[in-house]
Structure formats: C-alpha cells, structure tokens
Curated annotation (Swiss-Prot):
SUPFAM superfamilies hit by this protein: PIN domain-like
Protein name: Ribonuclease VapC32
EC number: 3.1.-.-
Cofactor: Mg(2+)
Domain PINc as annotated: residue spans: 2-112
Protein family per UniProt: Belongs to the PINc/VapC protein family.
Role this protein plays: Toxic component of a type II toxin-antitoxin (TA) system. An RNase. Upon expression in M.smegmatis inhibits colony formation. Its toxic effect is neutralized by coexpression with cognate antitoxin VapB32.
Biological process according to GO: negative regulation of growth
Lineage: superkingdom: Bacteria
Species of the source: Mycobacterium tuberculosis (strain ATCC 25618 / H37Rv)
Gene: vapC32
HAMAP family reported for this sequence: VapC_Nob1 (MF_00265)
EC supergroup of this enzyme: hydrolase
Lineage: Bacteria, Bacillati, Actinomycetota, Actinomycetes, Mycobacteriales
Cysteine pairings via disulfide bonds: none
Length: 124
C-alpha cells in the first residue's frame, strides 16, 4: 500500500497523474485523514466528490501525539523544516507493514530515507 502525500494529490488534481490513476485502479493508493484535511483547506474542483473519494480509500492509521514525539526524538527530525503532518505521515507508514510513502516534498523524502521509511519510486 502506498500513502499518497498531499503534494502528489495537488498535482494530480491539476493534471491527472497516470501512475496515480493506475494505483487507484489497483487499490494500491491509500490516504490519511491529515492529508484529507490539508486538501480540504485548499481550493479544489468538485470539492465534496473529491473529499468523499479520498475518505473511501484505504486509510492509514493515525499515530498518537506521544508516538509522534517519540519518532521525532528517536529519528532526530527536529530542525529539518518538516511539519507536524509530515511527522504523522512518517509514523503512519512505519506502522503498516510493506507500506511506502509517495511524496514530492524534498525534505520529507530526505527524512524518509534517513528514518528507514520506504519511498514509492517516481515514474517519469
């Protein structure tokens, strides 16, 4: 299962991403409540339809506040320009066996690599 980050969804909503379409068709794309919240704060066409579709994808688990703080401390994630949502996504992917994170955020990619969280490969 691949957790699709907000950065990928934003680009997909502007111009369809063929790889994401394929992952969706194969039920391999998952979402996270915080990604849905981030997208809900933006201007998106067919807002209700899109948010409903996202909510019906596989939902990655929400980690607790204490779990996020432990992750930040153990992996030394402070001072890297990551946000709270980024840390939550890292923790969430780490909880799901075999899961990967697909992001276009450079700082989040670097944190994944350093934390041992698998990244989904970009396909050009």
């Amino acid at each position: 299962m691949i957790l699709v980050d907000t950065s990928v969804w934003i680009e997909h909503l502007r111009a369809a991403d063929a790889r994401l379409v394929e992952l969706l068709g194969d039920d391999e794309a998952g979402c996270h409540p915080l990604v849905i919240e981030e997208l809900a704060l933006g201007s998106i066409k067919q807002r209700d339809v899109v948010l409903d579709l996202l909510a019906n994808l596989y939902q990655f688990p929400v980690v607790t506040h204490d779990e996020v703080l432990r992750l930040v401390g153990r992996r030394r994630l402070w001072g890297r320009g990551l946000g709270a949502v980024d840390a939550n996504l890292l923790g969430s992917v780490a909880l799901v066996g075999g899961a990967r994170l697909w992001t276009r955020d450079k700082r989040l990619k670097a944190a994944c690599a350093e934390s041992g969280v698998a990244l989904a490969e970009e396909v050009s």
